[in-house]
Each structure stands twice: as C-alpha cells, then as structure tokens.
Amino acid sequence: MEDSLLEIMTKDGGDMPAPLEVSTVPAVGDVISGEYNGGMKELMEHLKAQLQALFEDVRAMRGALDEQASHIQVLSDDVCANQRAIVSMCQIMTTAPRQGGLGVAGGKGSFPSVPHEPETPSPGIGDSGLLGRDPDEEDEEEEEEKETASPATPTSHCERSESPGLLGENGPLVEPLDLPDITLLQLEGEASL
C-alpha cells in the first residue's frame, strides 16, 4: 500500500512531504529540579539574613555585658575598700582599750605627783616615816601642831608646812613646786622601813 502511495505521489509530480516538527516539552525532572533550586536559593538568602541579624544582636549583647562587667568591677572595688575600712576600724576598736591602759600606766611613770597625792600620809604617819629624827623633836612638833591647827580638819599645806623636811633651821618654807619630790622621799623612806 505504501508503494502505491509513493507511486501516486510520484505520478502527480509532487515532492516528498517534509517531516513534522515536534515541539520540545521539558521533562518532569527538569521542572522539579528548577523549582527545588529556586526554593533553596530563596531559603538560603532568608537564613543568611536571619544569621546576620542574630550576629548583630549577639554583638550588642556582648557590648552590654562588657559594660555590666566594668560596673560590677567598680562595685567589687568599692566593696573591697569598705571591707578593708571595716577591718581596720575593728582592729582600732579592739586595741584601743589596751592603748588607753598603757597610757594610764605611762602617765603614772611620767607624772608621779598626780596619783600619789591621795596617798599622802597623815601627820603622825608621815612624820614617823622620816629618817634621822629625835624623839624630843617629835614631841615638840606634836605640841606645836595641836596649838596651830585643829586635829579634826588638818590641811595638806599645814601637814607639809609642819614637816621638818620642809623647814630650814631658820629659813623660809620650801617652794610648793618641790612638794611632790618631798612626798616621794617620804614614801621611799616608808618603803625602806
């Protein structure tokens, strides 16, 4: 039959018909691959933008943390300074009574006249404590004391003025500034007895 058709066509003097043009249809795999690649590209761009924003946030948080760390360091220095001040104050408070006691003891050594004044002996005790006295002189002085001063209210000035250590044979009274030394001599004489 094909041979008969060819013969008819050749008899008519016609040319051979041209082959039909077939339009190229994209394969399904190519379509899926293109869509996948496009979607992945958009997704990567979105993730990149999110990561960039996250990096900016982390950088800002790091700056804030550095500022907080410097503030904490300042507070820590203040706390350490306050702690050292409290420790030094506690040391001063604990050692202050001891220093005061030493000061009182030192005051006794440097100012002997002040604490020894209340311990001034009575006329009888003080006169008996002096060395190198005769019994006759003691009797005469006791009589003079009874005449000049009341025994109920003797004064320290009268007691010291009647002491033979303060009077010369016919001379004036010893100056009041020398009285503490005489008192010390009396106490030392009593201690030696």
Swiss-Prot record:
Residues 39-68 form a coiled coil. The keyword Transmembrane does not apply. Residues 101-176 are annotated as: Disordered. Keywords: Coiled coil. InterPro entries: DUF4677. One of its GO terms (cellular component) is cytoplasm. This is Coiled-coil domain-containing protein 184.
